[in-house]
A protein has these predicted regions:
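A short, aromatic-enriched beta-strand patch in the conserved N-lobe beta-sheet
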Residues: 191-192
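Conserved short submotifs of the Hanks-type protein kinase catalytic core
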Residues: 197-210
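Conserved N-lobe ATP-binding subsite of Hanks-type protein kinase domains
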Residues: 139
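Conserved N-lobe beta3->alphaC-helix segment of eukaryotic protein kinase catalytic domains
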Residues: 151, 156-182
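Activation segment signature within eukaryotic-like protein kinase domains
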Residues: 229-230
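Eukaryotic Ser/Thr kinase distal regulatory-tail detector
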Residues: 352, 392-447
Length: 447
């Protein structure tokens, strides 16, 4: 078997010729063969580990055997037992064993730990249980922290992609925001560490899954639910705004639910720190949630978040964002020029319509929240029945409790992700060379 790749070759005295395979589940396959072989044979199963770009040069094929029945290309010196191999958990760099335990690879650099008693964490401290999400720069997995057996969500970010897409600075800002926030309605950073290939953010695991999954299941929410969820999101946004942070990517996919039906805002990849009276000029976010001032690139601030909040309220009540169209250019034109319309099939209260219309005001200086932030939201009649302080302190019973059977239950996450194999993707040699050449760009993650 190859120490550098997923290759392995089956070779034996009684086998006509060698069998060559490549599989990310190699360890699992070999362990199965090992158990079956040892039941039928007295002599234990043996193997050879090679450090090669490819094992193809060591494969004895049909043509070789036909020319010379005793010929073999296989190296049979330095044979070892499979037990030794399985103990070592030899895997290609960046890979994870079939049972989810991360194999030895690089020394980890612990960048941040929220727990004062834990000074250092490394990849080997975590067992990967399930894939629960995927983003532009990597995947999110449910993991078990082996020293305490606690479950967390671990977001892995591939350094080669961060370099190629010039996202190192944004990722560093995301890390700084995650480690400084301390608020019950926001996902915070528990650990952060890096290896040669990746950066890892470890955060609380919220077993209720994305709000998006529940909205897709129920299609729309009642006004009671929307008031409860809206109050939490408004509080989370106001917390960020008071710290000079604009969120800029509000959508149901970035809102997570815990097992008690409460929400947390997650994923700060688009967030930005702004000074007083400063405006951001970049064009970023999810198209159907973009405020007009982002599309026109006239400069935006916290008011862009309140626009997105209005879009979110509409989507929760009506099932789709108000200006959604498959043609993005036409959608942008509608966002800039069209007034919001409400579907007749849904019986919305006047208060629900009014708050949405005031949040979706094209002029940010006339938009609800411009003068006095969340206080204007709280005072709107739509939220009359909500005690914001009680919601913040989790004293209000959630109108919906997600079904959760255990600490590792992932039924509330998309099966597209949870059915994936729990392995880290292979990073090509040329990309590894690029990472090594630019490793200095990640030094600030250790500060």
């Amino acid at each position: 078997m190859n120490k550098l790749t997923d290759e392995f070759v089956l070779h034996g005295r009684d086998i006509e010729y060698d069998y060559y395979y490549t599989s990310h589940r190699r360890n699992e396959i070999l362990e199965t063969i090992y158990n079956a072989y040892n039941k039928l044979n007295i002599e234990p199963f043996k193997f050879v580990v090679l450090n090669e770009k490819s094992l193809k040069a060591y494969v004895t094929n049909k043509k070789d055997k036909k020319s010379n029945p005793t010929f073999t290309r296989m190296k049979t010196d330095h044979l070892s037992s499979l037990e030794d191999f399985l103990k070592q958990r030899i895997k290609p760099k960046g890979e994870i064993n079939h049972n989810g335990v991360v194999g030895p690879q690089f020394d980890s650099d612990t960048v941040y730990s929220r727990h004062k008693t834990v000074k250092k964490v490394k990849l080997e401290d975590f067992k990967i249980l399930k894939v629960i999400g995927r983003g532009s720069f990597g995947k999110v997995c449910l993991v078990e922290y082996l020293p305490t057996h606690e479950t967390y969500a671990m977001k892995s970010l591939k350094k080669d992609i961060l370099i190629e897409q010039e996202q190192i600075e944004n990722t560093l800002l995301e890390k700084k925001i995650l480690q400084t926030i301390d608020y019950p309605l926001l996902c915070c950073l528990v650990f952060c560490f890096q290896t040669e290939e990746r950066i890892y953010f470890v955060m609380p695991f919220l077993s209720g899954g994305e709000l998006f999954q529940h909205l897709r299941k129920f299609r729309t929410f009642s006004e009671e639910k929307v008031r409860f969820y809206g109050a939490q999101i408004a509080l989370a946004l106001e917390y960020l705004h008071k710290k000079g942070i604009i969120y800029r990517d509000l959508k149901p996919e970035n809102i997570l639910m815990d097992d008690q039906g409460y929400l947390k805002l997650a994923d700060f990849g688009m967030a930005k720190k702004l000074g007083e009276n400063e405006k951001a000029m970049s064009f970023c976010g999810t198209p159907e949630y973009l405020a007009p001032e982002i599309i026109t690139m006239e400069g935006h601030d916290r008011m862009a978040d309140w626009w997105s909040f209005g879009i979110l309220l509409y989507e929760m009540l009506c099932g789709l964002p108000p200006f959604y169209m498959e043609n993005v250019d036409k959608m942008y034109d509608m966002i800039k020029n069209s007034q919001v319309k409400f579907p007749k099939r849904i019986n919305l209260s006047d208060n629900a319509k009014d708050i949405i219309q005031k949040l979706l005001e094209k002029n940010p200086k006339k938009r609800l929240g411009y003068k006095n932030g969340i206080e204007e939201i709280k005072k709107h009649p739509f939220f009359d029945k909500i005690d914001f302080k009680a919601v913040e302190e989790r004293k209000v019973k959630a109108p919906f409790i997600p079904e959760v059977e255990s600490d590792t239950d992932v039924q509330n996450f998309d099966e597209e992700f949870t059915n994936e194999e729990v392995g880290m993707s292979y990073i090509p040699k040329k990309n590894m060379e690029m990472i090594k050449k630019n490793q200095g760009m990640f030094k600030d993650f250790s500060n």
